Amino acid sequence: MNQAGEIRPGGRTARTRAAVLAAVIEELTDHGWDQLSVETVAQRAGVHKTTVYRRWRDKNTLVAEALKAAAENRIQMPDTGDVAEDLRELARIVRVLLTSREGAATTRTLAGHSHDADGVGQVLPVLWAARLAQAEPIVTRAVARGELPAGTSPDDLMKHLTAPLFHRLLVTAEPLTQASADQAAAAALAAARAGVFVPPGDG
C-alpha cells in the first residue's frame, strides 16, 4: 500500500506533476520568463494554483524543476565511425535544438538566471553535465581509433564546439545556420587534432 503523499508512478500525483512541468515549458516558450506565473501555469495545466504551491514554493523552484525534467530527455548522439562526421552531426543537432521555439526560450531562461543562488541558477551545471556524459563517448571512441590525441578533454572539446552556437543565439543574434554549425564543428575538430584540448602533462 502506498504511504500518504507518496508519488505513485503513473498515479494521479505523477500525472499532475507531468502536466504542471509541461505547462511551465509551454508558458516559457509562448510568453517568456517575465510573463510566466504560478497562476498562468496552473491554468494551462488545468489545476488549481494551490496544487502547484503545495509542491513548489515559488516561480523559481517551479521553473527549475521543469528545466531539470526537460534536461532528462536524451539526445541521440551520432556514432558514424568518423569523428569529423560525428562532431558535424552533433553541432547540427545542437543547432536544431537552439533554433526551436522551446529550445531558444529555455536556453535564454537558463542563461539569464545562471548566476542565481538557487533554483534556476543551479540547473545549467546539471544540464551541461548530463549532455557532456552523453557526448563523451564521441571523444573516447575517436581517441581509441587514433583520430584524436590521447588525453583529449571531452569537456573542453564540447565547450568549443557549442560555444559559437550559443554566442549567436545569446549575444550577436546572428542566424544559426547549418553552415555555422558545420564551421563550429570543423574549428573544434582542428583544435582537438592539434592537441589544444589535451591538459598539460597528459600529452
What is the predicted function of each stretch?
Residues M1-I7, E89, A133, P137-A144, ...:
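C-terminal peripheral helix-coil segments that are non-catalytic and often amphipathic
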Residues M1-R44, T50, T61:
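Basic, helix-initiating cap at the start of DNA-binding domains
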Residues V20, Q35, D58-V63, N73-R74, ...:
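Short amphipathic alpha-helical segment with a characteristic S/N-K-E followed by hydrophobic residues
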Residues T61, A66-L67, L98-P125, E136:
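Amphipathic alpha-helical segments used for helix-helix packing
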Residues D118-A144, D155:
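Amphipathic alpha-helical packing segments from all-alpha helical-bundle domains
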